[in-house]
């Protein structure tokens, strides 16, 4: 399995729909703003736990936010 494959995501759009800043989302899910930036730019795959927390915070299903 190739661990270099990055998930694509729609986090930025979903976050903006909820009128949340990157800092707001980071606080809600217990991470840093820089981590949210990296995930939104598809430079970093979140852990399963962090992905789930993001889905909960943005009130979206996993498949609505993440794709290959």
Role assignments for model-derived ranges:
Residues 1-17:
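A short, Lys/Arg-rich alpha-helix, primarily the initiator
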Residues 9, 19-20, 46-49:
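Residue-level signal for the short linker/turn that defines the boundary of a DNA-recognition helix
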Residues 16, 27, 56:
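Alpha-helical residues within the helix-turn-helix
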Residues 20-35:
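Short alpha-helical DNA-recognition segment
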Residues 49-64:
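DNA major-groove recognition helix of helix-turn-helix/homeodomain DNA-binding modules
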